[in-house]
Amino acid sequence: MNRIIEANFLPAPVEEAKEKPRILIIDNSRDFTYSVKLGLERTGRYSVWEENEPARAHQTAQRVKPDLILLDIAMPETDSGEVAARIESDPTLHRTPVVFLTALVTKSEVRSGLQIQGHPFLAKPISIPELVAGIERNLPALSHDGHIASLQHVTNN
């Protein structure tokens, strides 16, 4: 006896695990990047890379291809604005959001929506829940395969 099984009764295909958004932290403090990496990875939401040598930041970003970059604004002997500009001028990275991290502002200035050199910023010290909220505010929409999705604007006439 042959049985016909309708498609409605078959289990849904198991969706492959989506790639987590890639976050790159650029800060000269190894202790800071390590603790942030650990905290973010414990949320289970992100894959996190660290770069503690600002001179290698652009090269690391090219290799990692992050979905978002957290960049310390006050690193010795480094102009973080130049680091951000190099990343933004790279055709493979120009759409990657850069969020500055700084101890030079207050949390109320962050809440006011001010920007530094056209970039959003988060105040240090920062808790992991605050950091996750800041990342989620600035993380672009990701496609099903885990890469940045291009957004299309549709208007109704």
Q: Can you name each region flagged by the protein language model?
A:
Residues A7-E16, P140-N157:
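CheY-like receiver
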